[in-house]
Swiss-Prot record:
Lineage: Bacteria, Bacillati, Bacillota, Bacilli, Lactobacillales
Residues given in the record as Mg(2+) 1 binding sites: 290, 304
Free-text cofactor note: Binds 2 magnesium ions per subunit.
Species of origin: Enterococcus faecium (strain Aus0004)
Annotated GO biological process: cell wall organization; peptidoglycan biosynthetic process; regulation of cell shape
Catalytic activity: [beta-GlcNAc-(1->4)-Mur2Ac(oyl-L-Ala-gamma-D-Glu-L-Lys-D-Ala-D-Ala)](n) + n D-aspartate + n ATP = [beta-GlcNAc-(1->4)-Mur2Ac(oyl-L-Ala-gamma-D-Glu-6-N-(beta-D-Asp)-L-Lys-D-Ala-D-Ala)]n + n ADP + n phosphate + n H(+)
UniProt function note: Catalyzes the addition of D-aspartate onto the lysine residue in the peptidoglycan precursor UDP-MurNAc-pentapeptide. The ligation occurs between the beta-carboxylate of D-Asp and the epsilon-amino group of L-Lys. Is highly specific for D-aspartate, as L-aspartate, D-glutamate, D-alanine, D-iso-asparagine and D-malate are not substrates.
Name by which UniProt lists this protein: D-aspartate ligase
UniProt domain ATP-grasp: residue ranges: 130-332
Enzyme Commission code(s) on record: 6.3.1.12
Keyword Magnesium found: yes
Length: 421
């Protein structure tokens, strides 16, 4: 039974309509029995036909001025009851940035567990993020920053400071969302100089203005990746950290880097390194780090920080660390910090998170000890998904989610290849 502090009336408001939104809505439903309200510019499949999240579609809501005008109107029309608390949670990069930009105005009506925009800008842009990594002695891959003015007739004339293959990705992921060109991917692994010149030229021809990041490709397949989700409270104390070991990624061009199978993991060095960093920069809210093990020097190299919970972060809730509970206890119930809770892989409660059908995992994940352990977890029924939720079942929803999962079969057949380096 809830104690008196948890009887306080609050309403979770989610921004977006993707799997991240559904994972947060499910976390709130599991923890508090809440039905969430979401606002988005489009209705995406993971939240369709749901009984635990109501999505209101507002065209243009993912950009200003529609975003801030709508939020201030909603605040006055629907969220003005002083006896209630309204918790605002972004479930995508663009929405996280919009909340941070308008934090002062929005905080008059909503609880906004986000950092100020000055810090947000430093961390979200990969150029300044790698400068921050230098400052705080965090390992990251060898990097070359490319600016448009460095190109001559659409080509970068200088030699790269490392061998091919290389990784190429935008420094400004929010700006890149609206840039379209032939062969567009979220990020690229390029094998030759010719391929590199072609793609780089197309990106800037398409109107992208910010820097591009060229990096030494760290050898190894998806099983060398790690993902870390953290929650940091209003006083900059890290309340929760949960490390995941991705065993497979989505190979679809628009979704490269999205994890589709994650096993819980534990690494004391990673936990303490990231915890110290978050506290030093006075972070607050959810954070999500992508990193990869480099067998050449034994270090985990940071790729980026997402200033929100990760798209696949329901793996944290699935493993007993309910994401909604951490932010609610901090910001709504004002429960004091006691100690950092760390995710582990040792418990018999450890669960494998799956975003694709089992047959995809069994066919495409690399054969190794981790896969054997994951197969054992599946045999013991110690696995789960974000979108198949027993308290949110209907024929329409079940069929749509089955169709969504089935779609991965032709996608993997068409796009999958092993990343060896």
């Amino acid at each position: 039974m809830m104690n008196s502090i948890e009887n306080e009336e609050f309403i979770p408001i989610l921004l977006g309509s993707d799997m991240n939104v559904y994972g947060m809505a499910r976390s709130f439903n599991e923890a508090y029995g809440k039905i969430c309200q979401a606002y988005a510019s489009d209705q995406l499949a993971p939240t369709r036909y749901s009984k635990i999240v109501n999505v209101e579609v507002i065209p243009g809501f993912d950009k200003d001025p529609v975003f801030i005008e709508t939020m201030l109107r909603l605040a006055k029309e629907r969220y003005s009851d002083k006896s209630k608390k309204y918790l605002l949670i972004a479930c995508g990069d663009g929405y996280a940035e919009l909340i941070s930009q308008h934090k002062q105005e929005l905080s008059e009506y909503f609880i906004c567990p986000y950092i100020d925009y000055s810090l947000f800008e430093r961390l979200i842009n990969k150029v300044s993020f790698y400068e921050v990594c230098e400052e705080y002695d965090l390992p990251y891959p060898k990097t070359l920053i490319v600016r448009e003015e460095m190109l001559v007739n659409g080509h970068l004339e200088q030699e790269l400071p490392f061998e091919f293959p290389v990784a190429l990705k935008p420094a400004n992921s929010v700006e890149y969302l609206s840039v379209q060109f032939e062969g567009r991917k979220k990020a690229f692994i390029l094998e030759t100089r010719e391929e590199f010149d072609l793609i780089l030229g197309r990106i800037y021809e398409a109107g992208y203005k910010s820097e591009m990041i060229v990096q030494d490709f760290i050898p190894g397949d998806d099983s060398n990746m790690r993902v870390l989700n953290a929650y940091v409270d209003e006083d900059h104390q890290v309340r929760m950290m949960c490390l995941g070991h991705p065993l497979l990624e989505d190979p679809t061009p628009a979704s490269i880097g999205n994890y589709v199978v994650i096993m819980p993991d534990y690494n004391e060095k990673i936990y303490q390194t990231i915890k110290a960093f978050l506290e030093k920069i006075e972070y607050t809210g959810f954070a999500n780090f992508d990193m990869k093990y480099d067998p050449r020097d034994g270090e985990y190299k940071l790729f980026e920080i997402n200033l929100r919970q990760g798209r696949s972060s329901f793996f944290v809730t699935l493993n007993g660390l309910n994401l909604a509970r951490f932010v609610t206890e901090d910001r709504v119930f004002n429960k004091p910090f006691v100690e950092t809770t760390y995710g582990t892989n040792q418990s018999d409660k450890a669960r494998l998170w799956m975003g694709v059908p089992k047959k995809i995992f069994l066919e495409y994940a690399r054969e190794n000890e981790d896969k054997k352990l994951a197969e054992q977890m599946i045999k013991e029924n110690r696995y789960g998904t974000t979108v198949f939720y027993e308290k949110d079942r209907s024929i329409k929803r079940w069929l749509l989610m089955k169709y969504m999962f089935h779609n991965y079969i032709p996608r993997f057949k068409k796009y999958f290849h092993v990343k060896e380096g």
